[in-house]
């Protein structure tokens, strides 16, 4: 087997004829500044070729169903194992997909409950069993030898026969006695006495099969088993033992029934919400239905009923419902002055479904009654509008969000149903399985299933996802969470001899959780895989077996291998300047400095009683005109606080359209000092693939106008529109301004051909003849941002330069002016948005919220980012950052650390203050890692 993956002459994107040997079965980190060519090497070369070889090994029929990849532009690649790419993408938009199904843990849970689950009657809570003759034998042996008992079977009257006729038939078959009303009777005596026959109720009559005494002798046991079999046959699957003379009875059945209910025997489809055999019939396995949404009816849970928490009971006419409810509430001691969130479930039910005293009135006053009235008046337009205003996805009233039919919840293991288990956090579920004790039979049956479940749960905890629940929908996960779930699935499958390529697996991870992730990556390596990570996290880089640094800079100034080797060689070059920015930071030559002072503040926005998701009703003070960093381990409540409450609440207070914020009591403090609030996230900058960074920062408008003002353009009658590739007029109509034409091939990769009409230049020939200092519009679009700044600055085009300069300031000087926004990474999208705001001339105080802005950023780029943040603050703006990167945290003016753990054990403020104050907190995980950066 090859010891190396040998790459010769890679020329993908900006890679400059790169050749290198990557050791197999090692943990390899690929680093470099943004745009240096890391992804081109890892994904567009290694993964693309590995996937292409796999697909080409399949039949033409199979290939038509798979993604088609072009052969990378490379001389050759040798020793390449099968490649698996795990990217930062939310893989599933399917509302049925959950953490449990995507990790396959739920499939194993279904099998586990089908194999060893015990069904319990919802009436008596007794276990439902299918009996056999051994159960009857064991029951008899509970009594002392010599104890008399009788084996009976219920009298089964065949349809169309009377009781007398059935007794005659049984008499002819050799049965002499029946048991009824606690006594034995001879059948011939009953048939001879009409009065006695009429007094018998068929359901109380049992046929005597045998009378015996308890004995452990072989012949006696054989006789008992034969009689029991006969009793089951005659009783159509049921029989009874009666011990004499006490008349103590025991019932047995070969049918799965109890308390008059016939139960479904557990099977794996019974626990599948994706199967009609297991899904709740009301919501069809989604867990939600369209109905009256509690969040829309009661948007502010901090208000009481008296204060008007019920939104639909506002106004002169509808307010009468609130007044009447408050008037009646006194009789039932309903606390009308209590905030809605503080009401017990009993009182919430009264508000929604009706007061007990409503039975003394002709009409009920409740939210349900109100909407019944609205539905009854739907023929009026105003009532239809009102109904639509309060309708939304609500928890299914039948399964209460469990997704399964009620029969599935009756099956339990150690008192827990499958619905109970998927509602537990992964960490608690792992503990439950580790503490699970089964009898010998169940342990043997479940051994393999338990191993698979526990392994996968262990990996989820190890990659920092212990706070998730298995019923969490996949489409609500972040890109980082989704990537780590895919990593867990790969680990659980135990594949060996493969090449795993991961794109920044540390995204969304606190430094504490990064340590766990490193252990998982090493486990993946140790079982016989090659693990390649494209990464910037310092801890991961320091733990890699082998480091490849692509650079030295971005775009055309990158694409070279500036360092390859093990980490020992990096440290050997201590404090020595090299071409590699990564090595310079790792060996201590370069570093991100700690600010000499912190900005002071005296104004703040205050959120009172934040309790969305796992937040524990906390009061948070967010300073204005400074940089605040919100830290905490994964799942501690950072996004809930900032993105779920602060952002929508502040937008609504500023009279802007926003989603309903999460639960909180009040927004106080100096929020009126803010004029705008902006969420700078990693979503694409444009909905169209035709949008590009130059259009987003409004530089392209000025460029088009510049070309329209040229003498030749005026002579030809061209306007600014003629220099747009998105509008008719000047663009090439053959390719619609794309420069290429895509030809779909059924069994091969799509052919992307250069447009023959414009030769890839996107515009008509006469438009391209218009030049500005020998550069036409196509030449400008092919320039990088840095080249464009240099070109336009040279000829005094300050407007264009001023709009492009922020892109360079945030480290995006390497991207092309005309590069499609669909090719930008999440981190690049975020920085394009940041550049747009830096370029804005308006001075209205704005609150900027950034969600992990260091995603995809090298140490070298983080310094630029911090300068951009400082530029915004100097203009009077406020910055709040959700971040795990300690280099950013150490530059904060104020830190709010949430935790102490994720999930239910999080949601508290562990500590807050300047970085110097934070490191004194012993309970904070952030303090431990921040201290290393400050001291």
Predicted regions span which residues?
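Conserved phosphate-binding elements of NTP-dependent enzyme cores
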Residues: 1-935
